[in-house]
């Protein structure tokens, strides 16, 4: 989201508004990472399922009031409210179950500011006539070592992996 006169990075906007409250920052970060929304005042949802403040607090090792206060602050701030009432979970992450589904996983670690890595990696995979079942990119503002995770229908050749390593900005690749 871009707000004129402010940085365009979503996490920086959230962080600025919560900078005096580390516990609330922790809660807000978890809401973003897990795709949890704040709607209907101060209720926290995973998709259409309302979640308990107590269980969220327990998971994050914070007081339940910190969870409630975070939701109240989000609801009272027009920018935060507009972001958090629209966040949704991204769906299942297949990488951990890939081998049981007959898929392979390619993890690409790269400079997060380099443009075109997803497109170039997808083009190389398509050259081998391999379908991509899922692509998930970590947010570099939320993850210390962000990566692009590709779940593919079959194991890619070593040649394709070597070509991926030559994509500008790519630091390393792992497969499983």
Segments predicted by a language model, with ranges:
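Gly/Ser-centered flexible loop/linker motifs
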Residues: 46-47
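Short alpha-helical "recognition helix" segments of helix-turn-helix
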Residues: 56-57
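A conserved regulatory-domain signal marking ACT and ACT-like small-molecule sensing domains
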Residues: 2-5, 11-33, 38-43, 73-176
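Helix-turn-helix DNA-binding elements, focusing on the entry/boundary residues of the two helices
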Residues: 53
């Amino acid at each position: 989201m871009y707000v004129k006169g402010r940085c365009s990075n979503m996490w920086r906007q959230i962080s600025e508004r919560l900078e005096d409250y580390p516990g609330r920052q922790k809660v807000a970060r978890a809401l973003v990472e897990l795709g949890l929304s704040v709607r209907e005042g101060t209720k926290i949802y995973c998709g259409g399922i309302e979640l308990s403040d107590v269980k969220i607090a327990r998971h994050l090792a914070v007081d339940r009031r910190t969870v409630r206060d975070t939701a109240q602050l989000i609801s009272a701030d027009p920018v935060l409210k507009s972001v958090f009432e629209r966040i949704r979970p991204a769906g299942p992450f297949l990488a951990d179950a890939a081998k049981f589904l007959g898929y392979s996983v390619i993890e690409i670690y790269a400079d997060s500011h380099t443009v075109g890595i997803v497109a170039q990696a997808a083009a190389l995979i398509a050259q081998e006539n391999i379908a991509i079942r899922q692509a998930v990119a970590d947010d570099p503002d939320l993850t210390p070592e962000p990566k692009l995770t590709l779940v593919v229908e079959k194991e890619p050749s070593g040649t394709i992996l070597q070509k991926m390593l030559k994509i500008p900005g790519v630091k390393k690749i792992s497969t499983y």
